[in-house]
Amino acid sequence: SKKLKVLMSGGGTGGHIFPAVAIAQEIQKRFPDAEFLFMGANGKMEMEKVPQAGFKIEGLNIAGFDRGNLLANVNLPFKVISSLLKARKIIKEFQPDFAVGTGGFASGPALFIAARMGIPTFIQEQNSLPGKTNIFNAKKAKKVFTAYPNMEKFFHGTKTLFLGNPIRKNIITDIIDSDINKEKLGLEKGKLTILSVGG
């Protein structure tokens, strides 16, 4: 039988990368023979984090719009064109069954080209205020999975499905083994532990 092939794209920050990894891990759990290919931005953290999670990644020479330094955007149109062409070549060779985008500028060309090539695309939005890339790609997406309810106004209504944020398997394991983790931190087992984060 034919192997399931999945294209994943998202990056720039951990907020885009780690949900993509979590989705890939869950698909892998359900379809152990599935093949994955991530598409990210060269020089960004996904180029390191995705291989660490055990997945293959291809880099695009893409960057976001720099609002602070307008001169830095001079090469942006060329970067977009070269990224679209490279994304097309990668997708043509890999031939995914579907593509999942989690936002960040790298997922723009990847999902745009996938949709143009007739490949079903899906979006996962982690934020209550969606990013521009996900809003743009949602127009052609089959479904948009959101972390928060009532996101229809951003994503053409019927396309949205509120599922919450995906969590990586090592995080779930750490939560289940909370007593072991308390021991590592020198805390007492069985006692309620509160973590306070600010800043």
Show which residues each predicted segment covers:
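Cofactor-binding loop segments of dinucleotide-utilizing enzymes, especially the Rossmann-like FAD-
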Residues: G11, A41-G43, I62, Q126, ...
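Active-site-proximal region of nucleotide-activated glycan assembly enzymes
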Residues: A115-D179
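Nucleotide-sugar donor-binding and catalytic loop/hinge architecture
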Residues: S1-L4, I176-I194
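Glycosyltransferases and closely related glycan-assembly transferases
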Residues: K86-A99, S107-F122, I135-K143
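Short amphipathic alpha-helix
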Residues: H16-I27
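Conserved nucleotide-sugar phosphate-binding/catalytic loop shared by glycosyltransferases and other
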Residues: V6-G11, R30-K79, L84
